[in-house]
């Protein structure tokens, strides 16, 4: 694995919610952060069929354009009763004809699909969030870190915190959805200490323990 020697890192996302979460996770490590949106970098087409492939596409595009190491997250929701859908295509389920994303409609779409197959009980709605974080360099080298969290797709949505599908995801062992949790509840962790709750924080913890040092 390759360390981030320059202490400079590009966050390869134009998603405001995701950028906020990643920036919060990176903060203790004293890195100079810039986002793809700030740098006005183009958004590459996510043509991969795995989370790893799409994470690499985004990270390498930013690294190639800037000459700096770039971090990208590709994440999604897998619902067992739907054969793992929406999975790697999670963001596409929210895509509208004008190019924007409407996650309220996407959550409703999942609920409609579950109703169609008669998946009404909590036991029939097992789901998980998956996050793959990729750090890529301009020479095409990359490291990958995967995190996941098991839970249940619940309806109706609850909470207005977080972003995306957070209001419909109830993690196992908890009474609050991700949409009802504070940032600390969802992402809090310490190096070489407890396992964080969220999929993204779990992936980032692996990255930090392998590539980063506290500032």
From Swiss-Prot:
Its EC number is 3.6.1.66. Its cofactor is Mg(2+). Binds 1 Mg(2+) ion per subunit. GO terms for biological process: nucleotide metabolic process; purine nucleoside triphosphate catabolic process. CDD domains: HAM1 (cd00515). Substrate binds at residues 13-18, 75, 163-166, 186, 199-200. GO terms for molecular function: dITP diphosphatase activity; ITP diphosphatase activity; metal ion binding; nucleotide binding; ribonucleoside triphosphate phosphatase activity; XTP diphosphatase activity. InterPro entries: dITP/XTP_pyrophosphatase, ITPase-like_fam, RdgB/HAM1. The active site is at residue 74. Homodimer. Pyrophosphatase that catalyzes the hydrolysis of nucleoside triphosphates to their monophosphate derivatives, with a high preference for the non-canonical purine nucleotides XTP (xanthosine triphosphate), dITP (deoxyinosine triphosphate) and ITP. Seems to function as a house-cleaning enzyme that removes non-canonical purine nucleotides from the nucleotide pool, thus preventing their incorporation into DNA/RNA and avoiding chromosomal lesions. PANTHER family: INOSINE TRIPHOSPHATE PYROPHOSPHATASE (PTHR11067:SF9), INOSINE TRIPHOSPHATE PYROPHOSPHATASE/HAM1 PROTEIN (PTHR11067). This is dITP/XTP pyrophosphatase.
